[in-house]
Amino acid sequence: MLHTAFISNILANYLGAMSIILPNILTVSGDIKYIGAGLASVGILGTGVGQGLIGQGACLAIGRNPEMASKVTSTMIVSAGISESGAIYSLVIAILLIFVV
């Protein structure tokens, strides 16, 4: 019983605070679009890690077999281009959120 009263008290306080804060947040749409753009650009982190792993694999492959350097390099460039598309999409969404919305 004690937990039920405690949780209902916390929930009532939370909803009371949100009823005051939420209308102010919704009117400040200019600031929220920058937060959304920042969250949209989180996709760039995976691209950086992926391209680092691609470069590492290419360097290891060329180190093991230097004769295949041209094929490994061309495959590495194609793979880096494919992984870069996620960062470009994230950047486009962030720019749209900042300048269009």
Swiss-Prot record:
Signal peptide: none annotated. One of its GO terms (cellular component) is proton-transporting two-sector ATPase complex, proton-transporting domain. Keywords: ATP synthesis, Cell membrane, CF(0), Hydrogen ion transport, Ion transport, Lipid-binding, Membrane, Transmembrane, Transmembrane helix, Transport. The keyword Kinase does not apply. It comes from the Bacteria. The chain crosses the membrane at residues 35-55, 81-101. It is found in: Cell membrane. Disulfide bonds: none annotated. The record marks E84 as: Reversibly protonated during proton transport. Pfam families: ATP-synt_C (PF00137). InterPro entries: ATP_synth_F0_csu, ATP_synth_F0_csu_DDCD_BS, ATP_synth_F0_csu_sf, ATPase_proteolipid_c-like_dom, F/V-ATP_Csub_sf. GO terms for molecular function: lipid binding; proton-transporting ATP synthase activity, rotational mechanism. It is a multi-pass membrane protein. Belongs to the ATPase C chain family. F(1)F(0) ATP synthase produces ATP from ADP in the presence of a proton or sodium gradient. F-type ATPases consist of two structural domains, F(1) containing the extramembraneous catalytic core and F(0) containing the membrane proton channel, linked together by a central stalk and a peripheral stalk. During catalysis, ATP synthesis in the catalytic domain of F(1) is coupled via a rotary mechanism of the central stalk subunits to proton translocation. F-type ATPases have 2 components, F(1) - the catalytic core - and F(0) - the membrane proton channel. F(1) has five subunits: alpha(3), beta(3), gamma(1), delta(1), epsilon(1). F(0) has three main subunits: a(1), b(2) and c(10-14). The alpha and beta chains form an alternating ring which encloses part of the gamma chain. F(1) is attached to F(0) by a central stalk formed by the gamma and epsilon chains, while a peripheral stalk is formed by the delta and b chains. This is ATP synthase subunit c.
